[in-house]
A protein has these predicted regions:
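Catalytic-site neighborhood detector that most strongly recognizes the C-terminal catalytic loop/helix
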Residues: 21, 103, 165, 264-289
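C-terminal catalytic core of tyrosine-transesterase DNA break-rejoin enzymes
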Residues: 83, 132, 136, 142-143, ...
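Basic, Lys/Arg- and aromatic-enriched nucleic-acid-binding interface segment
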Residues: 68, 83, 87, 94-141, ...
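Active-site/catalytic core of tyrosine-dependent DNA strand-transfer enzymes
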Residues: 185-234
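DNA breakage-rejoining catalytic core of tyrosine-based enzymes
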Residues: 44, 87-89, 100-118, 168-185, ...
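Conserved tyrosine-mediated DNA breakage-rejoining catalytic core shared by Y-recombinases
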Residues: 146-194
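N-terminal core-binding DNA-recognition domain of tyrosine site-specific recombinases/integrases
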Residues: 2-8, 12-79, 84-86, 102, ...
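DNA/chromatin major-groove-contacting recognition/catalytic segments
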Residues: 115-119, 170-172, 180, 274-294
Length: 294
């Protein structure tokens, strides 16, 4: 009889060289801290009903996204056991997926963006440029932190997004579609060019030790939070700059959802429609009935 732990360890070992560091950390934490209560069980003795009960109890502690991660791990572990003929049925097949309700985005208004950028002039040039890149390119914060001068082509007015930084270091961006080109708009061009001229290190954003930042923690704690507080603007994460860019470029230009999905580095238009187009539609006035259809 094979134990659950045997296949759980195999799952981690197989993924060790395939996953990004962040994914590896997440799955290791789930297997060792959440699923370890199954370790000594014979894998064929684990039933769908008891897993369903466990997930029901977990709903009181964690959200749907985390539950989906738990389910994904279990599914892959049981699938390995099925491949090895240790079980004939994967109990996860009998569990329904958890409905994921994403919180509604709250982008900044046009006037708030102007006020924020103006007020940021009291802070470092580094922080000012971080905000301008966020608001004028829609790049993810990790992608901005990984940006090097060699990734910027001022002649073609393009930024080449190739890497992203996080607490796990520097890696390829979120998806294959995230490796992309982002246009440098007029409002950003001169400021970015000037900033690069007086940046003597390849990375655009480095700390006092001349090393690139891994997270936006310092910007958030020492600049972003105090800035919003001083302006009486409700706090939102720096990542909301990306949502602000997306909603405003959809509202104010002729860009299509497909083109926007490519600018943002999404693998499909689904996110653009579900998040940004839907948000804009909800902001519109009541449907005008005096229009001429034909």
């Amino acid at each position: 009889m094979m134990k659950f732990k045997y296949f759980a360890d195999m799952f981690l070992e197989i993924g060790m060289n395939e996953w990004k560091p962040s994914t590896r950390f997440k799955y290791e934490s789930i297997v060792t801290k959440r699923l370890n209560f199954l370790n000594d069980r014979e894998i064929e003795s684990i039933k769908a009903s008891e897993l369903r009960l466990w997930f029901s109890q977990m709903r009181q502690e964690v959200g749907a996204k985390t539950l989906r991660d738990y389910k994904s791990c279990l599914n892959q572990i049981f699938q390995l056991a099925k491949y090895d003929l240790a079980i004939s049925i994967n109990p996860i097949d009998f569990l329904k997926n958890f409905k994921l309700v994403k919180p509604q985005i709250k982008p900044f208004t046009d006037s708030e963006v102007r006020i924020i950028l103006k007020a940021s002039e009291c802070y470092s040039k580094k922080f000012q440029m971080f905000l301008k890149l966020g608001f004028y390119t829609g790049m993810r914060t990790g992608e901005i932190l990984a940006l090097k001068k060699e990734n910027i082509d001022f002649d073609k007015r393009l930024i080449y997004v190739k890497l992203s930084r996080s607490k796990f270091g520097e890696n390829s961006p979120k998806t294959s579609g995230s490796i992309r080109r982002v246009p440098i708009v007029d409002a950003l061009y001169r400021d970015l060019e000037y900033y690069c001229i007086f940046t003597f290190i390849d990375y655009l954003f480095v700390n006092q030790y001349r090393e690139p930042y891994n997270t936006d923690f310092s910007f958030t704690r020492y600049c972003w939070k105090p800035l919003l507080k001083s302006l009486n603007i409700p706090y939102r994460k720096l990542y909301v700059m990306r949502h602000t860019y997306a909603t405003n470029i959809l509202k104010n230009t002729n860009i299509s959802p497909y083109e926007l999905s490519r600018l943002l580095g999404h693998s499909s238009t689904e996110m653009v429609y579900n998040r940004y187009v839907k948000f804009i539609d909800n902001q519109k006035d009541e449907f005008k009935r005096d229009i001429k259809i034909y």
